[in-house]
């Protein structure tokens, strides 16, 4: 199966060349930044070209405004008045793409602590994480889930040049069944609270798709199965019915949006693929039949492998709720770094 990243390039704007080493010197290229000079020339020891698999010695990169005009060797003709940046022995790399992020979340948070986080606070967390993500080498990301459309606001702030960060494709609130992984299940019934993306039934999910598109979603995210951090559900069980998935995905595609689904359950993965989902997120219990279906439907897997290592390292210091501690070992066994 092809890697997810190759196809998701069509979901995102083409990334600018990210000069990794230049960040240490305080040189940051950000999306849609208004240029103050006509041209910039960057020199370094090497440049990696992933298209050809070659490493170019003594590269010269010519940047005009926000666009890379040319990449060549020392004999590349450059404007006489261009700003010169010589990075010495550094190696230049293209910007990376992360297709599963939650920039407005605090990685160490969860459980009842999340109830105290306001939407403005989440947006500010997103501004912090967006900058760190760019400095880590990622020039484009797909953000698949944020309350209150905080990710939409963050995307727009980055595009306007008000916040430093990568280009973003965002989903807004993820869709899910009442009481499911994408709902908010921590408050007692007298509060009558449900997450923004909660929707049940064919007509309701179609309406919810239209709503999140109305408020700025570039991509649609829904939860096809239970998860780890959600209270009262089972990651091995399907949540949306096949009919609901079909309606949700069909309506999303009709409105020109790709669809990603959180799916651990073997059955949920297969039903989502048959319904035409574009990507499976996580896919913990994906089996051989599911893999074959994904190949037949040209569906991509986003395995999100890194959290396996992150949780193994940080779980002892986190105040994980009891239901997370019960679920985690079956979904996140101690990972092998081989």
PLM feature spans:
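N-terminal secretory signal peptides that target proteins for export/translocation
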Residues: 1-11
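Bacterial N-terminal signal peptides
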Residues: 14-26
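Histidine-rich, glycine-flanked metal-binding segment
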Residues: 33-38, 47, 52-93
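Metal-associated gating/positioning segment near the N- to mid-region
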Residues: 90-162, 178-181, 185-188, 243, ...
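Active-site mouth loops of central-metabolism enzymes
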Residues: 112-124, 188-207, 258
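Short, acidic/polar
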Residues: 122-130, 201-211, 264-268
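Divalent metal-dependent hydrolysis catalytic cores, especially in the metallo-beta-lactamase
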Residues: 125-151, 165-174, 217-230, 258, ...
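Active-site core of metal-dependent hydrolases
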Residues: 178, 223-336
